[in-house]
Amino acid sequence: MKQYFNCIGIVGRPRHSTALITHEILYKWLIKKGYQVFIEYNISKKLNLKNPKTATLIEIGRLCDLAIVIGGDGNLLFTARILSYFNIKIIGINCGNLGFLTDLNPDNKFKKLSEVLSGKYFVENRFLLDVMIYKKEQVSKSSIAINEVVLHPKNVAHMIEFEVYINDNFAFSQRSDGLIISTPTGSTGYSLSAGGPIIETSLESILLVPMFPHTLSARPLLIRSDSVIRLRFSDIETDLKISCDSQIVLPVKKKEYVFIRRSNYYLNLIHPKSYNYFETLTSKLNWSKKFF
């Protein structure tokens, strides 16, 4: 039988014994099927396996053509920010809460994985966001995000002032608790909680969602994904932060400004052929069922 994947990496950040057991069972299942399998080095030390092949995340990105992430969406976000720099496909087994990205149910994971490994899958290329903090025309800090980039104050419930430029054109100024700049992937995350719309993941767009703005006229704004966003701040602003996927935090100092744009890198997320995005929304968000 043709092998669509030759080398597979198993990654995750397990916090519960059930997730650790899933790592062990999956490793043995893949080895039995004849695949070359690497387990992320930090996880392997916690598993009861005899001489498994181990690798760092970067090594998995270089060596493997498929990474299986075991955990919740947070695990996949952490992993994908590194693996997106490599030509590797990613699929997730949900051991967390919602599981918008890790869409394989642990109860039927082997059935769905068998479909994928036999070539019955499709690829979604989810774009990322680059964020760069500039000081005197030089990049002082940078990162990437899959879900969203969030501007917020260091202190909770502290209003800030900023201006937003899109493609070097002034768009709006705002007094608010911050601003969420989201990808379509992130539209079911933080921005949804802030009143933003859900964006179908194949749409090439970026979403700007105000956080508790001090005006009723402030509304979410959807722009083209090839737009370049620049954030400027008044000289009195101090202790501002930029958060990427709620996992990486970059401080913004006085006289610094922020650029956000679509990255050249993608998350190569794969799904079984039977995957249905709207079915996922219905089940995860408890939407109404069909009438007929």
UniProtKB/Swiss-Prot annotation:
One of its GO terms (cellular component) is cytoplasm. Keywords: ATP-binding, Cytoplasm, Kinase, NAD, NADP, Nucleotide-binding, Transferase. Pfam families: NAD_kinase, NAD_kinase_C. It catalyses: NAD(+) + ATP = ADP + NADP(+) + H(+). Its EC number is 2.7.1.23. NAD(+) binds at D73, G74, N147, E148, H158, R175, D177, T188, G189, Y190, S191, L192, S193, Q247. Its main location: cytoplasm. It comes from the Bacteria. GO terms for biological process: NAD metabolic process; NADP biosynthetic process. InterPro entries: ATP-NAD_kinase_N, ATP-NAD_kinase_PpnK-typ_C, NAD/diacylglycerol_kinase_sf, NADK. It is found in: Cytoplasm. It is an enzyme of class 2 (transferase). Belongs to the NAD kinase family. One of its GO terms (molecular function) is ATP binding. The active site is at D73. Involved in the regulation of the intracellular balance of NAD and NADP, and is a key enzyme in the biosynthesis of NADP. Catalyzes specifically the phosphorylation on 2'-hydroxyl of the adenosine moiety of NAD to yield NADP. Coiled coil: none annotated. Its cofactor is a divalent metal cation. It comes from Buchnera aphidicola subsp. Schizaphis graminum (strain Sg). Disulfide bonds: none annotated. This is NAD kinase.
